[in-house]
Amino acid sequence: MNSKLNSAMYSAHMIMRHAFGYNDYNNKYGRINDVYNKMADGKRLRLEEREVKSLRGLVCTLKMMIKNTDIITYDEECCICMAKNNRKEALPCQHNVCRDCYYKPMRNNCPVCNMEWPMRKDDKHAAPYGLAEYAHTYGGEEQRTPSPPVLGTVEGGDISPRLVGAIRTNDTWLSSRRDSPYHIENRIHNNNNNNYDENNPDDLPVIHPPRRRHRQTAHISI
């Protein structure tokens, strides 16, 4: 008896929550909850006339809602984790997101269509989304930080700003002597002799950017 009532109460809760809005259904749901508490004791109900009328009206409303409700099937994949057979959250954009992903730290927007989810913003059970989750959607202990560009000059001219912006290196490769003239000359010497160690980042060959060729124009006087 109690299991059937719990299932019925949950269904009524979800239907009323989506039909009346996420902030206006509390009073209506409270009426059904009062009747549920009395039915859970297994005794014959003793209701006032106003409670009976209110309950009948809500039952009729729920029946109308059920007729206009689309049945959600759990065979569809979650658009975040691609898992099936999980209970999905009802979203205004009609995309499928499982509850595990829905309550994790993420933006209040659909990852597929970028539609806003105002109800998630007001949900106290949803984890907030902050700067820590900006680069990594679900956060975690390890946060990725962008590596700094390689600065300095090499033989043959300065590195162009565009090339500097494109060169990225790991933090473990950086050292105080990486861009020193002696270190660069040593790497050039190893490169010419083909005796550098591929497993040692400091011995990797130095790549010289091509020199910029200036266009030569000839002025012909007539």
Curated annotation (Swiss-Prot):
The lineage of its organism: Viruses, Duplodnaviria, Heunggongvirae, Peploviricota, Herviviricetes. InterPro entries: Znf_RING, Znf_RING/FYVE/PHD, Znf_RING_CS. Transmembrane segments: none annotated. GO terms for molecular function: zinc ion binding. This is Putative RING finger protein ORF118. Residues 184-222 are annotated as: Disordered. Residues 209-222 have a biased composition (Basic residues). Keywords: Metal-binding, Zinc, Zinc-finger. Residues 189-198 have a biased composition (Low complexity). A zinc finger (RING-type) spans 78-114. The keyword ATP-binding does not apply.
